[in-house]
Amino acid sequence: MMHRLFKHMAPLAVLALGTALSGCDGADIEINGQKGVPLAELDMSGPAPTELVLSSGDEVILTEGQTFDLTVEGEGTDSLRIVRDDKLIGITRKDGWNGEGKATIRITMPPPEELVIAGSGSVKAQSLASTSSINIGGSGSVDFASVAAKTFEVNIGGSGKIKGAGTAERLEINIGGSGDVDLAALKADRAEVAIGGSGDVAFASDGTVEASIAGAGDVKVTGNAKCTVNAFGSGTLTCNPAADSPAPALPAEEPAE
């Protein structure tokens, strides 16, 4: 399971590093090989995007709707740059991290299939698509109200935070760092968790849970799940019945040969 963690963390590390370096030299940041345009030059026609990339320290608020719309407010909006293609809407700054102030970007679009944050920005969403993923490379955060997912994937490379509620037939969480995934209000039929570092994870399940922990990460599962752990270090997997007294944590230990 740890090889899967490394597979997911590598692209996030490259994304976060590239964004940081672009900001350091004052260069504009590209998303999918494109430089953004000011809002006044953005083409608002065509189908609504299904993916969001936030590559700045700004706040994005998503409202569910089939007709695409985007408005901005707050400080430094003149330096916002927006990328759009047939699937993606991307938010960045003209001068990378040196863009002045903090803006709030309000976007109307269908429940996103993918959310990507490179840096310290934040996203608040009403809902996510039935097949969806959240990817954070840095200290950004995502807060979503609900999801009813067939598959839901979370990848954090850094200290990012995610909080949300809902259900998922299959949940996959990968953390490379000190990320915090608070899905205590989300119930998964099946879950796989891989942590390389001190990340913390919480969710509910009455199904099967597999965890692989290399470090001091902690996974807390509420419900009657069948839990197994493969750990190196002080990390733990704790599975508690919802209304019963706490069960002892499954300690980190060397896997049986």
Outline where the language-model segments fall.
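Fold-core signature of tandem repeat domains
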Residues: 117, 123-125, 134-136, 142-144, ...
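Acidic (Asp/Glu) and glycine-rich low-complexity loops/linkers
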Residues: 2-10, 20-118, 122-135, 146-150, ...
